[in-house]
């Protein structure tokens, strides 16, 4: 299983502090890949090794990735006992919580950590590309560009995007 999150901005970065939509529900988070702050939500998802989205949780944008991991694993009940995450899931406390639940979390080391070159296996990093390609396909279904103005609209548009992705996945897989 692979775990990661992607941002769902509600407005352009210039409007982060003036936005009135979802006030009280959304807040400002940081998108490290583009090095920008955004106002909105973050979707945390667990994906199977071959790319099927098993479960997801929507949080405020400022919520750290590791916070939702235990809840996602409790909801999913996977038969696979290995979980692959990125550097955002580093931490002894999270590793211990998941180990108590019977799961093994594998995260690559940061470049400045000792033993990073030996630990960061290119084959496992290639498996992580699965979830990154899934998230880019979700962009095709407008999961990241959710223009809803109500919570019900936001939830339904996100669920439709994930459903459309999973249906396309099944059609491609079984044909």
Residue ranges and their predicted role:
Residues 57-60, 151-153, 174-175:
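Short alpha-helical "patches" and their helix-cap loops
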Residues 81-82, 87-152:
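Helix-centered, glycine/charged polyanion-binding patches within enzymatic domains
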Residues 68, 130, 159-162:
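Catalytic-loop motifs flanking and including active-site residues across diverse enzymes
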Residues 9-15, 116-118, 159:
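Short, solvent-exposed polar/charged micro-motifs at secondary-structure junctions
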Residues 1-87, 92-101, 110:
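Polybasic low-complexity intrinsically disordered regions
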Residues 159-175:
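Charged phosphate-binding loop/patch that engages nucleotide di/tri-phosphates or the phosphate backbone
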Residues 33-36, 149-158:
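Structural motif
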């Amino acid at each position: 299983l692979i775990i990661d999150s992607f941002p769902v901005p509600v407005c352009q970065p210039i409007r982060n502090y003036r936005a009135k939509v979802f006030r009280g529900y959304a807040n400002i988070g940081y998108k490290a890949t583009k090095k920008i702050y955004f106002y909105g939500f973050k979707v945390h998802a667990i994906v199977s090794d071959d790319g099927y989205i098993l479960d997801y949780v929507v949080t405020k944008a400022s919520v750290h990735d590791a916070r939702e991991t235990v809840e996602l694993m409790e909801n999913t009940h996977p038969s696979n006992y290995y979980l692959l995450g990125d550097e955002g899931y580093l931490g002894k406390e999270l590793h211990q919580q998941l180990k108590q639940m019977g799961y093994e979390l594998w995260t690559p080391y940061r470049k400045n950590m000792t033993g990073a070159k030996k630990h960061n296996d290119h084959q496992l990093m290639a498996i992580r590309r699965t979830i990154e390609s899934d998230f880019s396909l979700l962009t095709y279904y407008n999961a990241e560009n959710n223009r809803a103005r109500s919570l019900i609209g936001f939830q339904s548009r996100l669920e439709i995007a994930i459903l459309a992705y999973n249906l396309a996945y099944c059609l491609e897989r079984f044909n």
